Amino acid sequence: TLCLNVTPTSIECQVANACLSPKGEFEYLQIDAPTPQALLSEIEKCWHRHRKLWPDRTINLALAIHGQVDPVTGVSQTMPQAPWATPIEVKYLLEEKLGIRVMVDNDCVMLALAEKWQNNSQVRDFCVINVDYGIGSSFVINEQIYRGSLYGRGQIGHTIVNPDGVVCDCGRYGCLETVASLSALKKQARVWLKSQPVNTQLNPEKLTTARSEEH
Protein backbone atom coordinates (compact mmCIF):
# COMPACT_ATOMS: atom_id res chain seq x y z
CA THR A 1 0.00 0.00 0.00
CA LEU A 2 1.21 3.48 -0.86
CA CYS A 3 0.47 5.73 2.11
CA LEU A 4 0.15 9.44 1.35
CA ASN A 5 -0.27 12.42 3.65
CA VAL A 6 -1.93 15.02 1.42
CA THR A 7 -2.23 18.79 1.86
CA PRO A 8 -2.83 21.50 -0.77
CA THR A 9 0.93 22.21 -0.87
CA SER A 10 2.66 18.91 -0.15
CA ILE A 11 2.50 15.12 -0.34
CA GLU A 12 4.39 12.74 1.94
CA CYS A 13 4.82 9.24 0.50
CA GLN A 14 5.73 5.88 2.03
CA VAL A 15 5.08 2.34 0.80
CA ALA A 16 4.15 -0.05 3.63
CA ASN A 17 3.27 -3.73 3.85
CA ALA A 18 0.31 -5.29 5.67
CA CYS A 19 2.23 -5.15 8.97
CA LEU A 20 2.78 -1.39 8.51
CA SER A 21 6.50 -1.91 7.99
CA PRO A 22 7.95 0.73 5.62
CA LYS A 23 9.27 -0.43 2.27
CA GLY A 24 11.52 1.75 0.14
CA GLU A 25 12.34 5.38 0.81
CA PHE A 26 10.19 8.04 2.45
CA GLU A 27 9.49 10.92 0.08
CA TYR A 28 8.40 14.51 0.69
CA LEU A 29 7.08 16.46 -2.29
CA GLN A 30 6.13 20.10 -2.54
CA ILE A 31 3.27 20.52 -4.99
CA ASP A 32 1.33 23.30 -6.69
CA ALA A 33 -2.34 22.34 -6.73
CA PRO A 34 -4.58 25.34 -7.51
CA THR A 35 -7.57 23.08 -8.31
CA PRO A 36 -8.98 19.72 -7.14
CA GLN A 37 -8.05 18.25 -10.52
CA ALA A 38 -4.45 19.36 -10.06
CA LEU A 39 -4.32 17.74 -6.61
CA LEU A 40 -5.65 14.44 -7.96
CA SER A 41 -3.12 14.62 -10.79
CA GLU A 42 -0.27 14.98 -8.29
CA ILE A 43 -1.54 11.95 -6.38
CA GLU A 44 -1.76 9.95 -9.61
CA LYS A 45 1.80 10.89 -10.60
CA CYS A 46 3.06 9.80 -7.20
CA TRP A 47 1.28 6.45 -7.51
CA HIS A 48 2.58 5.80 -11.04
CA ARG A 49 6.13 6.55 -9.93
CA HIS A 50 5.94 4.04 -7.09
CA ARG A 51 4.11 1.51 -9.27
CA LYS A 52 7.16 1.38 -11.52
CA LEU A 53 9.35 0.60 -8.49
CA TRP A 54 7.15 -2.37 -7.52
CA PRO A 55 5.92 -3.75 -10.87
CA ASP A 56 5.06 -7.20 -9.48
CA ARG A 57 2.90 -5.88 -6.61
CA THR A 58 -0.59 -4.45 -6.37
CA ILE A 59 -0.12 -0.94 -5.01
CA ASN A 60 -3.31 0.29 -3.34
CA LEU A 61 -3.64 3.78 -1.86
CA ALA A 62 -4.21 4.97 1.71
CA LEU A 63 -4.71 8.73 1.83
CA ALA A 64 -4.53 10.89 4.96
CA ILE A 65 -6.13 14.19 3.99
CA HIS A 66 -6.26 17.42 5.98
CA GLY A 67 -9.70 18.72 6.82
CA GLN A 68 -13.16 17.18 7.01
CA VAL A 69 -13.34 13.79 5.29
CA ASP A 70 -16.18 11.28 4.91
CA PRO A 71 -14.39 7.91 5.29
CA VAL A 72 -17.39 5.96 3.95
CA THR A 73 -17.70 7.72 0.60
CA GLY A 74 -14.08 8.88 0.48
CA VAL A 75 -15.09 12.48 -0.14
CA SER A 76 -12.87 15.35 0.99
CA GLN A 77 -15.62 17.69 2.15
CA THR A 78 -13.51 20.68 3.17
CA MET A 79 -9.76 21.23 3.00
CA PRO A 80 -8.64 24.32 4.96
CA GLN A 81 -6.16 26.60 3.18
CA ALA A 82 -6.94 25.02 -0.19
CA PRO A 83 -7.77 27.54 -2.96
CA TRP A 84 -11.11 25.81 -3.59
CA ALA A 85 -14.23 25.30 -1.48
CA THR A 86 -15.91 22.39 -3.26
CA PRO A 87 -15.92 18.74 -2.09
CA ILE A 88 -13.69 16.24 -3.95
CA GLU A 89 -14.78 12.65 -4.59
CA VAL A 90 -11.24 11.42 -4.01
CA LYS A 91 -11.94 7.71 -3.54
CA TYR A 92 -14.30 7.30 -6.51
CA LEU A 93 -12.22 9.32 -8.97
CA LEU A 94 -8.91 7.64 -8.11
CA GLU A 95 -10.37 4.13 -8.09
CA GLU A 96 -11.92 4.74 -11.50
CA LYS A 97 -8.70 6.19 -12.90
CA LEU A 98 -6.15 3.79 -11.39
CA GLY A 99 -8.16 0.58 -10.99
CA ILE A 100 -7.07 0.01 -7.38
CA ARG A 101 -8.54 0.16 -3.88
CA VAL A 102 -8.36 3.58 -2.26
CA MET A 103 -8.91 4.33 1.44
CA VAL A 104 -9.41 7.96 2.46
CA ASP A 105 -9.62 9.45 5.93
CA ASN A 106 -8.71 12.54 7.93
CA ASP A 107 -4.99 12.93 8.65
CA CYS A 108 -5.48 13.06 12.42
CA VAL A 109 -7.62 9.92 12.33
CA MET A 110 -4.84 8.16 10.43
CA LEU A 111 -2.33 9.29 13.08
CA ALA A 112 -4.59 7.93 15.82
CA LEU A 113 -4.99 4.60 14.03
CA ALA A 114 -1.23 4.31 13.58
CA GLU A 115 -0.74 5.04 17.29
CA LYS A 116 -3.36 2.46 18.20
CA TRP A 117 -1.87 -0.27 15.98
CA GLN A 118 1.80 0.43 16.65
CA ASN A 119 1.83 1.35 20.36
CA ASN A 120 2.26 -1.64 22.67
CA SER A 121 1.09 0.16 25.81
CA GLN A 122 -2.51 -1.08 25.34
CA VAL A 123 -3.98 2.33 26.17
CA ARG A 124 -7.72 2.25 25.46
CA ASP A 125 -8.40 6.00 25.53
CA PHE A 126 -6.16 8.73 24.16
CA CYS A 127 -6.04 11.85 22.01
CA VAL A 128 -3.67 12.64 19.14
CA ILE A 129 -2.96 16.32 18.41
CA ASN A 130 -1.42 17.31 15.09
CA VAL A 131 0.17 20.76 14.91
CA ASP A 132 0.99 21.73 11.34
CA TYR A 133 -0.11 24.74 9.30
CA GLY A 134 -3.37 24.04 11.12
CA ILE A 135 -4.21 22.24 14.37
CA GLY A 136 -6.26 19.07 14.44
CA SER A 137 -6.92 16.17 16.77
CA SER A 138 -8.48 12.74 16.94
CA PHE A 139 -9.89 10.84 19.91
CA VAL A 140 -9.75 7.11 20.56
CA ILE A 141 -12.35 6.11 23.17
CA ASN A 142 -12.59 2.51 24.32
CA GLU A 143 -10.22 1.57 21.47
CA GLN A 144 -12.54 3.08 18.84
CA ILE A 145 -12.14 6.24 16.78
CA TYR A 146 -14.65 8.85 17.91
CA ARG A 147 -15.96 10.50 14.74
CA GLY A 148 -18.91 12.57 15.92
CA SER A 149 -21.70 13.85 13.71
CA LEU A 150 -20.80 14.62 10.10
CA TYR A 151 -17.23 13.45 10.81
CA GLY A 152 -16.39 16.88 12.21
CA ARG A 153 -14.94 15.87 15.58
CA GLY A 154 -11.47 16.95 16.69
CA GLN A 155 -11.52 20.38 15.07
CA ILE A 156 -9.81 21.95 18.09
CA GLY A 157 -7.91 24.34 15.84
CA HIS A 158 -11.16 26.25 15.39
CA THR A 159 -11.86 26.62 19.10
CA ILE A 160 -12.05 30.37 19.72
CA VAL A 161 -9.42 31.42 22.26
CA ASN A 162 -9.47 35.17 21.57
CA PRO A 163 -12.75 36.65 20.28
CA ASP A 164 -10.90 39.86 19.39
CA GLY A 165 -8.08 38.05 17.59
CA VAL A 166 -7.18 37.89 13.91
CA VAL A 167 -9.46 36.34 11.32
CA CYS A 168 -9.07 32.61 10.69
CA ASP A 169 -9.36 30.81 7.34
CA CYS A 170 -12.70 29.45 8.56
CA GLY A 171 -14.05 33.02 8.69
CA ARG A 172 -14.23 33.38 12.46
CA TYR A 173 -11.93 35.41 14.69
CA GLY A 174 -9.40 34.24 17.25
CA CYS A 175 -9.33 30.50 16.56
CA LEU A 176 -6.56 28.48 18.21
CA GLU A 177 -4.95 28.03 14.77
CA THR A 178 -4.40 31.78 14.51
CA VAL A 179 -2.06 31.78 17.51
CA ALA A 180 -0.58 28.29 17.89
CA SER A 181 -0.30 26.63 14.45
CA LEU A 182 3.04 26.49 12.64
CA SER A 183 1.91 29.09 10.12
CA ALA A 184 0.82 31.43 12.95
CA LEU A 185 4.09 30.94 14.83
CA LYS A 186 6.09 31.68 11.68
CA LYS A 187 4.10 34.87 11.17
CA GLN A 188 4.69 35.93 14.78
CA ALA A 189 8.41 35.18 14.39
CA ARG A 190 8.66 37.33 11.25
CA VAL A 191 6.91 40.22 13.02
CA TRP A 192 9.22 39.88 16.03
CA LEU A 193 12.35 39.76 13.87
CA LYS A 194 11.35 43.01 12.17
CA SER A 195 11.26 44.68 15.58
CA GLN A 196 14.88 43.74 16.31
CA PRO A 197 18.00 45.79 15.45
CA VAL A 198 19.09 45.42 11.83
CA ASN A 199 22.40 43.88 12.82
CA THR A 200 20.80 41.15 14.94
CA GLN A 201 22.18 37.80 13.80
CA LEU A 202 19.62 35.07 14.34
CA ASN A 203 18.91 31.73 12.76
CA PRO A 204 15.79 29.56 13.16
CA GLU A 205 17.50 27.29 15.72
CA LYS A 206 18.29 30.24 18.01
CA LEU A 207 15.05 32.15 17.52
CA THR A 208 13.08 30.43 20.30
CA THR A 209 15.95 30.83 22.75
CA ALA A 210 16.35 34.51 21.95
CA ARG A 211 12.63 35.14 22.37
CA SER A 212 12.58 33.29 25.71
CA GLU A 213 15.55 35.25 27.05
CA GLU A 214 13.77 38.51 26.21
CA HIS A 215 11.01 37.53 28.64
Task: Please give the residue ranges for each predicted region.
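Gly/Thr-rich phosphate-binding beta-strand-loop-beta motif of the actin/hexokinase/Hsp70
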Residues: T1-G24, V128-V140
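Short, surface-exposed charged micro-motifs
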Residues: C3-N5, R101, H158
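Hydrophobic beta-strand positions
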Residues: V15, Q68-V69, F139, I160
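Hydrophobic "anchor" residues
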Residues: P22, S76, I145-Y146
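Glycine-rich phosphate-binding loop and adjoining helix at the ATP-binding site
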Residues: E25-D125
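A mobile "lid/hinge" subdomain adjacent to the ATP/sugar-phosphate binding pocket shared
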Residues: I65, L176-E214
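Glycine-rich phosphate-binding loop of actin/hexokinase-like ATP-binding domains
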Residues: Q122-V179
